[in-house]
Amino acid sequence: MENFQKVEKIGEGTYGVVYKAKNKLTGEVVALKKIRLDTETEGVPSTAIREISLLKELNHPNIVKLLDVIHTENKLYLVFEFLHQDLKKFMDASALTGIPLPLIKSYLFQLLQGLAFCHSHRVLHRDLKPQNLLINADGSIKLADFGLARAFGVPVRTYTHEVVTLWYRAPEILLGCKYYSTAVDIWSLGCIFAEMVTRRALFPGDSEIDQLFRIFRTLGTPDEVVWPGVTSMPDYKPSFPKWARQDFSKVVPPLDEDGRSLLSQMLHYDPNKRISAKAALAHPFFQDVTKPVPHLRL
């Protein structure tokens, strides 16, 4: 740790404080995440160390690179490449004008490339949200915190007792499914896609039941026809109100037919029928994809 000089605190992640830091030996600027675990007393679980070490092998231009894992005195520090801004801050800064569609398309395409890569290595994210999608001035966007959920679990609250957001959580997780798949990440990315387009969160729930009901009000309450097996999921209740599905042209008005088609496939209730990242990359929506540069106010 003595090799790093902390420059400033960037923010509070799910698991601990994140600092901008400088490697004293190389001059490289990095993001330093201190992982606060409940098991501080017993030290860091060896399973977590093993999981995290595997992530050093995940090399892809749309994945934030884990440069190093430093394990000292019951504390764990993760050293990541440094990026300028997260998508949440960028969306907030672009709230008046909106993000131009070519940039939205580029971001979605790049994120799907990152997902396809991780999913092909059987690594899930499980907690995708605009805060852990990081952007650079050159038009790149990268997925951060990949694999941390499996190593440390997804807590209900962060170490500072902030509630971990449910807005991007897939319905199978909300309905208590214990065994979920890569499809949970596609759902989250679909919600983020819609948010970039409309400039507001698609399903901003404030509790698990509110989250589910917001999804149901938009996509219709699922039944055995659209989602075989849904009625036997642990948290499914036959007493759920029966809402009808809304037309997607009302849900994401700025999107063209290709965009709506892709979004509806990313938000398919049945995880087995939800489009994969690899298939999404071949969708007609991306036939004219480019890589524009964002106007960053840093």
UniProtKB/Swiss-Prot annotation:
Catalytic activity as recorded in UniProt: L-seryl-[protein] + ATP = O-phospho-L-seryl-[protein] + ADP + H(+); L-threonyl-[protein] + ATP = O-phospho-L-threonyl-[protein] + ADP + H(+)
InterPro entries tied to this protein: CDK (IPR050108), Kinase-like_dom_sf (IPR011009), Prot_kinase_dom (IPR000719), Protein_kinase_ATP_BS (IPR017441), Ser/Thr_kinase_AS (IPR008271)
EC number, as in UniProt: 2.7.11.22
Post-translational events: Phosphorylated at Thr-160 by CDK7 in a CAK complex. Phosphorylation at Thr-160 promotes kinase activity, whereas phosphorylation at Tyr-15 by WEE1 reduces slightly kinase activity. Phosphorylated on Thr-14 and Tyr-15 during S and G2 phases before being dephosphorylated by CDC25A. Nitrosylated after treatment with nitric oxide (DETA-NO).
GO cellular component, one term: cytoplasm
Co-factor note (free text): Binds 2 Mg(2+) ions.
Protein kinase domain sequence ranges: 4-286
Binding site for ATP: 10-18, 33, 81-83, 86, 129-132, 145
Gene3D superfamilies cross-referenced by the UniProt entry: Phosphorylase Kinase, domain 1, Transferase(Phosphotransferase) domain 1
Sequence similarity: Belongs to the protein kinase superfamily. CMGC Ser/Thr protein kinase family. CDC2/CDKX subfamily.
Role, per record: Serine/threonine-protein kinase involved in the control of the cell cycle; essential for meiosis, but dispensable for mitosis. Phosphorylates CABLES1, CTNNB1, CDK2AP2, ERCC6, NBN, USP37, p53/TP53, NPM1, CDK7, RB1, BRCA2, MYC, NPAT, EZH2. Triggers duplication of centrosomes and DNA.
Residues at the active site: D127
Annotated disulfide bonds: none
Top-tier EC class: transferase
Site for CDK7 binding, residues: K9, K88, K89, L166
Xref: SUPFAM superfamilies: Protein kinase-like (PK-like) (SSF56112)
UniProt GO BP: cell division; DNA repair; G1/S transition of mitotic cell cycle; meiotic cell cycle; positive regulation of DNA-templated transcription; potassium ion transport; protein phosphorylation; regulation of G2/M transition of mitotic cell cycle
Main location: cytoplasm
Binding site for Mg(2+): N132, D145
Location of Phosphothreonine modifications: T14, T160
Protein name: Cyclin-dependent kinase 2
Subcellular location: Cytoplasm, Cytoskeleton, Microtubule organizing center, Centrosome; Nucleus, Cajal body; Cytoplasm; Endosome
